[in-house]
């Protein structure tokens, strides 16, 4: 094990101390991630140490009890984002400001449209004279511009809809960008997809068959989890169920195993739904009058998936009336749910402590994007759009942020 030199000031004298690399790594691994990244610019030796698997394991172990940073972003992505709720003051990353503020806003030199995000990566669509896609880490300020897909210009109906990652040992090893020909999303048995892989640096075009008819695919509400993309088919009907989740495994080798159509768990249609992730699972939140039900998708392998009812709560015990509507779940704390109220404010409910917290208290709140988003959702709720499913994107960070994966050809 090599020794490394550390300068130490004592009694006005500059002393040079040599520390074993193993001891030095253990000391540095206790620091927040944002501080560790500064050491990479000291010299090649520091960079090599910090980027090693050995150091990464030390860091993950040292911060095993620390929560990670996250944000709930209002609505579907677009030209700009605004954080509804989040947490950034963790010892693991040590970020000085809210995580949502790192996502490039509207008004940069190029026009950036935010398409998707997952595991600390963000997919941007740059709309100028020449449309391009970029994937990067806003926190690390690393961006990779993707090569143009060869079918650009052939069909104006091809849109980027999703970003999915392959994570190993807490590190993003690869990502794939998925585009869809949206002319083929109404009452279809197959979909036309264009997929870019950071491993190969190339685009592929493929036609994938669905196990049953897709009635109406909501491509804008795309959720990424466990190497899979999830969309909504709010008009799907199976027995007495209304609505389904369309799950697509981007990394599956067998075409027959790539698509799953999973009906929603509750049998009634006259309630408010939201779908999100929490604790590494896909979660469906159903509100029927004053009853709130939380369903967790346990497996995808069966024909219709397997849901488990994890919570059933009477909202009157929290002082909520029937005007409250589900919005999202805490990304990691499965006992915390977020709801909107008639004043278009966001509240969180801790199902363990029975504590209700108001998250929007500013006097200028009515001028924010969050207020207008919740107002739109509330109008939809009051209009009794029974089949609608609300989706609030989450921007979360993995246990360790490595460099953005890129093909050797880029």
From Swiss-Prot:
Question: Does the keyword Repeat belong to this entry?
Answer: yes
Per UniProt, which keywords does this protein have?
Kelch repeat, Repeat
Q: Which residues form the signal peptide?
A: none
Q: Outline the extent of the F-box domain.
A: 13-58
Please give the SUPFAM superfamilies that the UniProt record associates with this protein. Answer: F-box domain (SSF81383)
Q: Which CDD domains match?
A: F-box_AtFBW1-like (cd22157)
Q: Where are the Kelch repeats?
A: 177-227, 274-327
Q: Does the keyword Repeat apply?
A: yes
Against PANTHER family, the record matches this protein to: F-BOX DOMAIN-CONTAINING PROTEIN (PTHR35546:SF25), F-BOX PROTEIN INTERACTION DOMAIN PROTEIN-RELATED (PTHR35546)
Name of this chain's protein: Putative F-box/kelch-repeat protein At1g15680
